[in-house]
A protein has these predicted regions:
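Bacterial N-terminal signal peptides that target proteins for export
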Residues: 2-20
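C-terminal motif of bacterial Sec signal peptides marking the signal peptidase cleavage site
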Residues: 27-30
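Feature captures hydrophobic
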Residues: 33, 38-39, 479-485, 492, ...
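Accessory terminal helices/loops
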Residues: 36-112, 228-259, 347-354, 361-555
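Active-site HxH/HxHxD metal-binding segment of metal-dependent hydrolases
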Residues: 60, 64, 69-72, 161, ...
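Conserved beta-strand hairpin/beta-sheet module of binuclear metal-dependent hydrolase folds
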Residues: 116-176, 300-305, 309-315
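Divalent metal-coordination and catalytic microenvironments
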Residues: 129, 144, 154, 169, ...
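Metallo-beta-lactamase
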Residues: 149-150, 157-159, 261, 265-270, ...
């Protein structure tokens, strides 16, 4: 995009501009960190050990076919640590070495097996001309040999992990240029490392095809802008970011190992896939792309290479039951549409012999690959159909989650077990998709908030000590769900009860140790950790996504700003501000009306103030990477009109730091 020289800076009083800068940069402010009760992770209880032993008896955990597939074609493995520019560790390739042994009592043996499979890190030959780099990030980077270079499929999460993967491939396969780049879908772990694969300048100079599904850029740049802070905080639970990598902590994430939170960016695609079947040749290789939107991701594609009898199922297909609604939060996914895409995939793969995806390991052989697709089709359709049947029979989401059980033909199949998604929360997702939050019982239409309800429960039972005593009885019996319910009331109703926090941490720990879903294990163990040590000092930093945010439409930022307005504080305010992005030829008028922040294109002559700045500076301030000094001395920022009103306006925007307490209040 052409850059326009901003007008000469109009000097203003340093004190007023300082106040403006401080208001605009308030995202840097952090909220207080509640203290925990201290303590360390414990061992498995006898009940948990017995539960995990039962899993060993009920599943053929010694099945070796998956291990043979996961290790097939091995070329080389990276060692050591992947470091960021500041020296911090982004990925430790040796961190999961503890998985080499048998499952301990502190791990569900089925999850342990899956975690062992995902621990096969390195460069692998899938077939002639097709290679995968696994374990450099949570997703796979796939290389397909074209006539002149590599066709790269998915670019991982960060510039650092993608660059490391490409360098490793260069080392072992020989250096080749990138001749095309394919983004299978608009989740950041598949495109965020694009700038580590190839630069924007090289794409433009060599006219390198960048292929993506229709709607990709809109989804890629806006997915987490609106509720990114809250979703990011919850993702720390889902992915177990702060847990130790050990038999007492993080084993896996279900789809792979760690998400590499380095520098994230994106390249705008120059070829979009709109059709259900769209042929295209890339660097001499004939592809058939399939547009499959609004299932696993709002913008997604799969593809076949007929000459190689190869099919890539993107993230619609994997070696786990996926999420219909991830516990970090998202819009509910359409289970029926997902099942229908799997049915179409069966037709598309009648002649396929090699099946790969955006996560996990390949499958060789048509019958086995089609079995995986059919099992996934039927897991999602069974979950959908049985949930709908029970909705129509009058059951509530929590009841249905207890009632729906997969038939043995599905539940005994490792490739569709709940390591990332979970049947119980997927059932609730189907309910939410059709019925929303309300279960139909008027008692649940306007219940008390959790803290107020907890206080009244404690009054009823005679205080937190009585609740803890009852919970201890449940804990000793291995009735952890009931113990957690009692103790959650005790912790919320009486924050001073150290015994409640201590026992709840122990309870969550046992629930985590028994969980087959890696995401559930991570959530329980993170809850236990935060009860002991408090919330983290740092959330998921916006600064890491600065290159991605540069490409986000300004309207998305303004929508998020409006959703951050402190409504009660704005109730009697009548302010109007012009925002002019001097390098983009974009102007917006922002105004308050009925405690709502509105905006539209253009400027208003009666605005109280006009803020002129470049979009990069605007984005840096939102991301928290532009310091006050940078702002004050920048020629990229000017203020016209009332600086006091400008400060008042931005002072009404909430400053969410993303480290709020989750298991306490």
């Amino acid at each position: 995009m052409k850059q326009h020289t901003p007008p000469v800076n109009l000097r203003v009083q340093r004190s007023a501009l300082a106040a403006t800068g401080l208001a605009l940069l308030s995202l840097l402010l952090a909220c207080g960190k509640p203290a925990g009760v201290g303590g360390a992770a414990g061992e498995a209880s006898s009940s948990t050990a017995a539960s995990n032993a039962q899993v060993t008896q009920s599943l053929p955990l010694d099945q070796r076919e998956d291990f043979e597939d996961a290790q097939r074609g091995f070329i080389a493995k990276p060692t050591g640590k992947l470091l960021a520019a500041d020296g911090s560790v982004l990925n430790d390739f040796d961190a999961y070495g503890f998985l080499a042994g048998p499952a301990p009592a502190t791990a569900n043996p089925s999850l342990w097996r899956h975690a062992q499979l995902n621990a096969n890190v390195g460069l692998y030959k899938v077939m002639d001309g097709v290679y995968q780099l696994r374990g450099f990030d949570i997703a796979n980077l796939t290389l397909i040999e074209g006539k002149s270079g590599w066709i790269v499929v998915d670019a991982l999460t960060s510039r650092e992990s993608a660059a490391a993967a490409m360098a490793f491939a260069d080392q072992h396969l020989g250096k080749k240029p990138v001749s095309a780049l394919i983004f299978t879908h608009a989740h950041v772990d598949h495109f965020g490392g694009a700038l580590g694969v190839i630069s924007q300048q090289e794409v433009a100079q060599r006219k390198v095809p960048v292929v993506a599904p229709a709607g990709f850029m809109e989804e890629a740049t806006s997915e987490n802008v609106m509720v990114g802070t809250g979703m990011g905080r919850r993702s720390i639970y889902q992915f177990g970011r702060d847990l130790p990598r050990s038999a007492l902590g993080n084993l896996d994430n279900g789809l792979g190992k760690d998400v590499v939170y380095g520098a994230m960016g994106v390249l705008a695609p120059n070829w979009l896939i709109y059709q259900a079947s769209q042929p295209m040749q890339l660097d001499g290789v004939d592809f058939i792309f399939h547009n499959v939107p609004n299932a696993e991701c709002p913008a997604e594609l799969t593809f076949s290479i007929p000459s190689k009898k190869l099919y890539n199922g993107a993230e619609n297909l994997s070696h786990t039951m996926h999420n219909l609604l991830p516990i970090r939060g998202a819009k509910v996914r359409d289970a029926l549409r997902w099942a229908n895409y799997m049915d179409q995939a069966l037709e598309q793969t009648k002649d396929t012999e090699v099946f790969i995806a955006s996560h996990h390991w390949p499958i060789w052989g048509n019958a086995r690959g089609q079995e995986l697709i059919a099992k996934h089709r039927d897991v999602y359709k069974y979950t959908h159909d049985q949930t709908v049947r029970l909705i129509n029979a009058g059951y509530t989401p929590r009841e249905i989650a207890e009632m729906v059980k997969l038939p043995a033909s599905l539940s005994d199949y490792f490739g569709a077990r709940g390591y990332y998604g979970d049947l119980r929360h997927n059932v609730k997702a189907v309910y939410q998709f059709y019925m929303g939050f309300y279960d139909g019982n008027p008692a649940n239409l306007n219940p008390l908030p959790p803290t107020e309800s907890a206080k009244r429960y404690l009054d009823l039972v005679g205080g937190a000590d009585k609740a803890v005593a009852a919970a201890q009885v449940a804990y000793d019996k291995g009735d952890y769900r009931w113990a957690a319910e009692l103790l959650n009331h005790a912790v919320l109703g009486d924050p001073s009860s150290q015994s409640a926090k201590t026992l709840l941490a122990q309870t969550y720990e046992q629930m985590g140790y028994a969980s087959e879903a890696a995401t559930w294990r991570n959530a329980y163990l993170t809850g236990a950790q935060e009860l002991r040590h408090g919330p983290p000092a740092q959330g998921v930093p916006k600064a890491a996504a600065i290159d991605l945010l540069f490409q986000t439409p300004t309207e998305r930022f303004l929508e998020a700003m409006a959703a951050s307005l402190d409504g009660p504080a704005a109730a009697d305010k009548n302010l109007k501000i012009n925002l002019v992005l001097t390098d983009q030829k974009e102007s917006y008028v922002l105004w308050l009306e009925n405690a709502v922040l509105h905006f539209k294109r253009g400027t208003a002559a009666d605005a109280h103030a006009t803020l002129l700045l470049t979009k990069p500076l605007f984005v840096k301030m939102i991301a928290g990477t532009a310091g006050v000094k940078d702002t004050l001395l920048s020629d990229e920022l000017q203020v016209k009109g009332s600086k006091i009103d400008l400060v008042r306006f931005f002072g009404l925007i909430d400053k969410a730091a993303g480290v709020f307490p989750v298991v306490t209040r």
